[in-house]
Amino acid sequence: MSERVSEEPGLDKGDRAEECELDDPELKAIRMRVREMEEEAERLKGLSGQDKSIGVSTRPCMQTTHSKMTAGAYTEGPPQPLSAEEKKEIDKRSVYVGNVDYGSTAQDLEAHFSSCGSINRITILCDKFSGHPKGYAYIEFAERNSVDAAVAMDETVFRGRTIKVLPKRTNMPGISSTDRGGFRGRPRGNRGNYQRGQRPRGRPFRGRGRPGPLNNPY
């Protein structure tokens, strides 16, 4: 006597195999894990694209430098090492900008100082531990006469703040390179080269005088 196998209408063997796979809890867990990993990768990709769009590096940095090599092109990274003469020449074409808003970018500063002349480099200093901006920047111009035009913008309002613009010096603004500190006056010592409250030992020397005439009673 032959056995009859009841089959549901409209389902073939492939459909039944797929239905069995969907009922497997381990397979469900694997698929959920893969889906979570894909979503996490998409989220990180979106954050990375956002950081690049605003010109902020995701790694901790001491300073964020935007160098304008060509029109509309910027590069990030620390400046290349320069000789002492090259640094002095660059400093003569640069200005210090203080009280800069922490959310400012190099593009914002370029737009504010674009009327002063062609800009070669904009450096926004960052804290080496947190990576957050310190609130001041340096702007290097292509020509020296642009420095005077930039200094004329001292105490102008930039992003709601009154900025301070000064010619850049080799050292920090307000600190003289020749000031070594310390007292340079002539020290005032005690007379006689002995401490207060002490007297020299022995009888004081009175010098030799000329003997006066002897009175002879005889």
From Swiss-Prot:
Localization: Cytoplasm
Membrane-spanning intervals of the chain: none
Occurrences of domain RRM (ranges): 93-170
Pfam families reported in the protein's UniProt record: RRM_1 (PF00076)
GO biological process, one term: nuclear-transcribed mRNA catabolic process, deadenylation-dependent decay
Keywords linked to the UniProt accession: Cytoplasm, RNA-binding
Annotated segments matching region Disordered: 1-24, 169-218
Cellular-component GO terms for this entry: cytoplasm; nucleus
Compositional bias segments (type: Basic residues): 198-209
Gene Ontology molecular-function annotations: poly(A) binding
Main location class: cytoplasm
Classification via InterPro entries: Nucleotide-bd_a/b_plait_sf, RBD_domain_sf, RRM_dom
Subunit structure: Homodimer; Upon poly(A) binding, undergoes a dimer-monomer transition that removes the polyproline motif from the RNA recognition site and allows it to be replaced by the adenosine nucleotides of poly(A).
Main function: Binds the poly(A) tail of mRNA. Unable to interact with the cap-binding complex and is therefore unlikely to be involved in translation initiation.
PANTHER family: EMBRYONIC POLYADENYLATE-BINDING PROTEIN 2 (PTHR23236:SF27), EUKARYOTIC TRANSLATION INITIATION FACTOR 4B/4H (PTHR23236)
Protein name in UniProt: Embryonic polyadenylate-binding protein 2-B
Source species: Xenopus laevis (African clawed frog)
